[in-house]
């Protein structure tokens, strides 16, 4: 059976991340204001689901999903500010993959 895990940050996650990292944090049209309740959507299709809001609930929710004999949707709420790495920048090749967030550079005044 299929198990689905939605990493739900309430945004178009990779689009928001690109805008943050490559477009000077100019966010445009990335917040999902009308996103449906994923758990209720799963039930509408006839299978079980659960929403997790706290990291402390994740292990038990994953175990519940694995133990379910049929399909299962786990909707995990995550911070909209968490980024996902590795990623390939716009127009970049695989050998230009970004493996971690850019580190701030200290600039000293002369």
Q: PLM ranges: what are they?
A:
Residues 1-110:
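Thiamine diphosphate
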């Amino acid at each position: 059976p299929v198990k689905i895990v939605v990493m739900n940050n309430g945004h178009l996650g990779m689009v928001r991340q690109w805008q943050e990292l490559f477009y000077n944090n100019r966010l445009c049209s990335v917040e999902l204001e009308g996103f449906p309740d994923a758990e209720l959507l799963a039930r509408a299709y006839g299978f079980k689901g659960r929403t997790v809001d706290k990291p402390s609930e994740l292990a038990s929710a994953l175990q519940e999903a694995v133990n379910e004999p049929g399909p299962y949707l786990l909707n995990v709420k995550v911070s909209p500010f968490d980024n996902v790495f590795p990623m390939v920048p716009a127009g970049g090749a695989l050998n230009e993959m970004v493996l971690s967030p850019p580190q701030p550079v200290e600039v000293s005044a002369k």
